[in-house]
Amino acid sequence: MALYEHVFLARQDVTSQQVESMIDTYKGVIEANGGKVEKTEMWGVKSLAYRIKKNRKAHFTLLNIDAPPAALAEMERQMRISEDILRFLTIRVEALETEPSAMMQKRDRDERKDRERGRRRDEDGFSGDRNEEN
């Protein structure tokens, strides 16, 4: 079977639970056609470079798929029909990544920086409450 990386963008007004149910639906399509989804990553809501179908933001999701081409074609057909999916892109790869993608690593790095900034504020005596001294 062929290996694929598949990214899709869901509308911004869809909830995270609805995105998870979409992922489960598309996993079911792949598995029903003889494939399997190796890894899923939800990258969260991100700004788009330009408006797509009147949306400025979208839920970004990555699926690593090991499936025959027919299974992928069926999943893409269902994505074209869905109004909640703005765009999708599927790329055939030689090997699937097992570690977190670059987007997840960037998010972890940003969260770590935010925690360090918070620690520095605490060390400087900043508590966030301006009326504490009065």
UniProtKB/Swiss-Prot annotation:
Residues 99-134 are annotated as: Disordered. Transmembrane segments: none annotated. NCBIfam families: S6. One of its GO terms (molecular function) is small ribosomal subunit rRNA binding. It comes from the Bacteria. It holds the Pfam family Ribosomal_S6. One of its GO terms (biological process) is translation. Keywords: Ribonucleoprotein, Ribosomal protein, RNA-binding, rRNA-binding. It comes from Methylobacterium nodulans (strain LMG 21967 / CNCM I-2342 / ORS 2060). The keyword Ribosomal protein applies. Residues 105-134 have a biased composition (Basic and acidic residues). Belongs to the bacterial ribosomal protein bS6 family. The keyword 4Fe-4S does not apply. This is Small ribosomal subunit protein bS6. The gene is rpsF. Binds together with bS18 to 16S ribosomal RNA. SUPFAM superfamilies: Ribosomal protein S6 (SSF54995). GO terms for cellular component: cytosolic small ribosomal subunit.
